[in-house]
UniProtKB/Swiss-Prot annotation:
Belongs to the RRF family. It comes from Shewanella oneidensis (strain ATCC 700550 / JCM 31522 / CIP 106686 / LMG 19005 / NCIMB 14063 / MR-1). GO terms for cellular component: cytoplasm; cytosol. Pfam families: RRF. GO terms for biological process: cytoplasmic translational termination; translation. SUPFAM superfamilies: Ribosome recycling factor, RRF. This is Ribosome-recycling factor. CDD domains: RRF. Its main location: cytoplasm. HAMAP family: RRF. GO terms for molecular function: ribosomal large subunit binding.
Amino acid sequence: MIADIKKDAQERMGKCVDATKNQMAKVRTGRAHPSLLDSIQVSYYGTMTPLNQVANVGVEDARTLSVTVFDRSAIQAVEKAIMSSDLGLNPMSAGATLRIPLPALTEERRKDFIKVVRAEAEGGRVAIRNVRRDAISDVKKLEKAKECTEDDVRRFEDEVQKFTDAHIKKVDEILAAKEIELMEV
């Protein structure tokens, strides 16, 4: 029973780390990467559709993304969706392909992004600690039901604390790498 709780807690903490990493990937750095446009929804024949379902997003060079639209009639809708996103991008049309030059980030904008990334990291840490708290409370319920001993609970708390620390360290490493990436000029 305790092993199941421990395994579940580790999986949930891993998911928290992955979710934090995915949230940080959405924060724009000076470099072009296709996941930058993942959150964009396009009005395609009256339905809001993810951009990656109506176009292929690729990297042309370090500061340029290329979006190849599958259906030529959707080029205007894709262009409008990219312009209306809060990313501050300005696509240029070239046939069935849109080229999106990424403007250089100002120092002030970089610092704003670092604040956002730090907030995401803190959210990830809090989620990991919540998983730890839930796991420990589950084991204490088992102790009250006389299904495990007090020593088992103490041992479990120590183990959970160790992998909580390990997962928080992963989040901190992801944060440090993202901060370095953001401050590159």
